[in-house]
Design a protein with these regions (language model features):
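Active-site-proximal substrate-binding groove within the catalytic cores of carbohydrate-active enzymes
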Residues: 1-142, 151, 155-157, 161-162, ...
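Short, surface-exposed loop motifs enriched in S/T, G, D/E and P with embedded aromatic residues
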Residues: 145
Length: 233
């Protein structure tokens, strides 16, 4: 029922925020709140955030520089150059696009990690304004045509600022057959961007973190997952 579903979502939100360090679970910090919204006492964080997807092989072979050099990574409305293992993107318009075609993907959920940072602030306030970076795959399941539904399931986005940061993009792909897919990355704004890595994994974006009184696992997939915590903790 709705009440049971709402409780599951609340627990999901508390667990996710706690793992990301955005929500404290030390009881005294929230003693002023009503009991029905106080978090469970996980205690203080004891370990680093674990990304379960990264325990599987990376399906995209090569650094961004290698992908560009081999002609696998292509861009529209931008100029690209190589710097070490990374690439520098200089947009020509307010929206530029990168694409990697013929990525061989198995069936099942896919998590993509993109590590990037902006490098040339056009004005004094730009370091306070992050950039939007979008990612999408071809041949995703059909969802409702409403904009918000597509943003939630297929046209995912993250934020990139002036410190190197890794965004994750998680795609649920029930009943999608294995085959060659296209990864599309869209960058908003005209500020130069440096992409350090692009990695693709055939696992849900499950996060795990150890606390004083608990080990918290957050599973955003639509299916149950079997995780051997001894492999991570």
């Amino acid at each position: 029922n709705d009440q049971h579903h709402a409780e599951r979502l609340r627990r999901f939100g508390v667990a996710t925020a706690s793992c990301l360090g955005a929500y404290t679970t030390v009881p005294d910090s929230y003693s002023f709140l009503p009991s029905w919204i106080q978090p469970c006492s996980f205690g203080r964080i004891q370990g680093e955030l674990i990304r379960y997807a990264k325990s599987s092989p990376n399906l995209l072979s090569g650094t961004p520089a290698e992908l560009l050099h081999k002609g696998i990574l292509k861009g529209e409305n931008c100029c690209m150059s190589i710097q070490g293992n990374s690439i520098i993107i200089k947009p020509a318009t307010q929206s530029s696009t990168l694409s990697i075609k013929n990525v061989e993907l198995p069936t099942g959920d896919i998590t993509i990690f993109i590590e990037a940072e902006t490098i040339t602030p056009p004005d004094a306030n730009s370091d306070l304004v992050p950039r939007f970076i979008y990612a999408s795959l071809s041949n995703l399941p059909d969802y409702e045509p409403e904009k918000k539904t597509k943003e939630f399931f297929t046209d995912l986005y993250g934020l990139v600022g002036h410190e190197k940061n890794e965004n994750s993009f998680y795609f649920r792909r029930p009943k999608v057959s294995a085959g060659k897919q296209t990864l599309t990355i869209t960058i908003k704004g005209t500020e130069q961007l440096q992409i350090h890595s692009i990695k693709i994994y055939n696992r849900p974006d499950i996060i795990i973190r150890q606390f004083e009184n608990a080990v918290v696992c957050v599973n955003p997939s639509l299916e149950e997952q079997e995780i051997h915590l001894s492999d991570f903790i």
